Amino acid sequence: MIEKIWFNNHPLKYFLWPLLWPLSLLFKMISGQRRDAYLSGKKETYRPPLPVIVVGNITAGGNGKTPVVIWLVEMLQAHGFKPGVVSRGYGAKAPNYPLVLDENTPAEHSGDEPRLIRKRTGAPVAVDPVRANAVKALLSEGVNVIITDDGLQHYALERDIEFAVIDGARRFGSECLIPLGPLREPMSRLDDVDFLVNNGGKAHGREFSMSLLPSQAVNLKTGQKRSVAELQKLVAFAGIGHPPRFFKTLENLDGDVVYTQGFADHQDFDKDELHALAKKGMNMIMTEKDAVKCEEYAQDNWWYLPVSAQFDEDSQQQILKRIKEVMEYYGSPST
C-alpha cells in the first residue's frame, strides 16, 4: 500500500498527509544534519588510500543498483583494473565481520547481493555493517579501486565518484521524503552526483540510459540454459525491491506465467514454502539474486533469469574516462 501512495497518487495519500508530512519534515531535518556533520568534519569519516566509487540511489527500494555494480566491475576488469566491492550485507548473518567472501560463502552469511556479485564477477567482495571496515579488509586483496553496492547516504565513507540509479518507469514518485514519499534525500542531491543512470526509461537531462538485458533461463541444479518461452506453466517469484519489474520482463519474453508471487527485498525464504509454491506450475523461475539463496535445496524444475546492465558506447566511454582520471590521480593506472 505504501508504494501506491508513493508512486501512484493513491487517494489514501491525502488522508494520511497530516500525519506523514510532519514526519517527512523531521526526516529531512535529521538526515540533512547528519550529512552536514560528515561533510563539515564534525563527524569522523574514512578516506581509503584508493579510489572509491559509490553506486546508490535517492529512493527507497530496488532500482537496479546491483546490475550496475556488476557492469562496472566487469568493465574495469576488462580494462586491466582490479576492483573490489564492499556492501553492508543486508540480511546477512555472518559469523564475524568484516567478511571477505570466497566461492563457497553462503548467502545467509553474506547477504544475497554480495554473494551474487562474487559469483558473477569473481572480484573480491567484503561485507560489514561499517563499510569502512569492509574497505580495510580488501586492502590486502590486491584491489586498486573500491565499488560500494549502495551507500550513497553512507557519508562516513569518503568517495570519489557517485552513481545514482533511477527507476526509469516510476522515477521519484511523489518527490516527497520518507515516509510521505520514497525519497531518502531531496531531489537537489542529484545535482552533486557524477552519473545519473536511468534504468529502463526515457533519459532526462544529463541522465545516461541503461537497460537490463535478460539472457536465457538457467537451471539451478544442472546449469542447463533454455529460453523463457520454452518453459511451460511458469510459477514466478521475486524477492527484490520491485517484483512487478521481473514479472514484466518474463511477459516481454513470452513466458507462460501461470502464477506470480512477490516477496520483500532480501527476504529469507522458507524451503517448504518454496517447494509448495513450485507445485502451482510445471516450472518455477526466479531472479538471479533470489537463486543464490536457495541453491542448496533447488528442485530439477527451478530456473533463474540472469540480467545484465547495458550502456551505449558513448556512455561507457564517458564513465571510463572519469574513472581513469581518478585512478591516475591516485597513481593506479590500468595494466
Swiss-Prot record:
GO cellular component, one term: plasma membrane
Root EC class: transferase
Family: Belongs to the LpxK family.
GO biological process, one term: lipopolysaccharide core region biosynthetic process
Pathway named in the protein's UniProt entry: Glycolipid biosynthesis; lipid IV(A) biosynthesis; lipid IV(A) from (3R)-3-hydroxytetradecanoyl-[acyl-carrier-protein] and UDP-N-acetyl-alpha-D-glucosamine: step 6/6
Molecular-function GO terms, alphabetical: ATP binding; tetraacyldisaccharide 4'-kinase activity
Pfam families: LpxK (PF02606)
Name of the gene: lpxK
Organism superkingdom: Bacteria
Binding site for ATP: T59, A60, G61, G62, N63, G64, K65, T66
Alphabetical UniProt keywords: ATP-binding, Kinase, Lipid A biosynthesis, Lipid biosynthesis, Lipid metabolism, Nucleotide-binding, Transferase
Species this chain originates from: Vibrio atlanticus (strain LGP32)
Catalysed reaction, written as an equation: a lipid A disaccharide + ATP = a lipid IVA + ADP + H(+)
Name of the protein in question: Tetraacyldisaccharide 4'-kinase
